[in-house]
């Protein structure tokens, strides 16, 4: 539920290595 400051509209989240996932076109962690 914490925004990672990255969007995933066109490309996947690069922050997935930090535990982030794509939700509603924005990368979130928990």
From Swiss-Prot:
This is a cyclic peptide. Keywords: Disulfide bond, Knottin, Plant defense. The keyword Disulfide bond applies. PROSITE patterns: CYCLOTIDE, CYCLOTIDE_BRACELET. InterPro entries: Cyclotide (IPR005535), Cyclotide_bracelet_CS (IPR012323), Cyclotide_sf (IPR036146). Disulfide bonds join 4-20, 8-22, 13-27. SUPFAM superfamilies: Cyclotides (SSF57038). There is a cross-link at residues 1-30 (Cyclopeptide (Gly-Asn)). It comes from the Eukaryota. Belongs to the cyclotide family. Bracelet subfamily. Probably participates in a plant defense mechanism. Has anti-HIV activity. The presence of a 'disulfide through disulfide knot' structurally defines this protein as a knottin. This is Cycloviolin-C. It comes from Leonia cymosa (Sacha uba).
